[in-house]
Amino acid sequence: MTRSLKKGPFVDHHLLAKAEKAVATKDKKPVKTWSRRSMVLPEFIGLTIAVHNGKQHVPVYVTDQMVGHKLGEFALTRTFKGHPADKKAKK
């Protein structure tokens, strides 16, 4: 179920303030955030946002195709190491 259009997109206020400050000062350092639930807005295009994945902050460069998606979609939380090898096949 998607969010109602009359409510608008959700973005944490502290993230929006940091992004506006970075745009105003033309700062190239990544904006560090733990807010994976925030939606990517058009104001974020061109910024690098460091999204926390539970262990570290993953730098995400925001492009125009990411607008409307959530930040957490671009910082994966699980690493797949592959299926364990079959012990019978080695013999």
Curated annotation (Swiss-Prot):
Cited function: Protein S19 forms a complex with S13 that binds strongly to the 16S ribosomal RNA.
InterPro entries: Ribosomal_uS19, Ribosomal_uS19_bac-type, Ribosomal_uS19_CS, Ribosomal_uS19_SF
Cellular component terms (Gene Ontology): cytoplasm; small ribosomal subunit
Biological process annotations from GO: ribosomal small subunit assembly; translation
Keywords of the record: Ribonucleoprotein, Ribosomal protein, RNA-binding, rRNA-binding
Classification via NCBIfam families: rpsS_bact (TIGR01050)
GO molecular function (one): structural constituent of ribosome
The protein's name: Small ribosomal subunit protein uS19
Family affiliation: Belongs to the universal ribosomal protein uS19 family.
The keyword rRNA-binding belongs to this UniProt entry's keyword annotation: yes
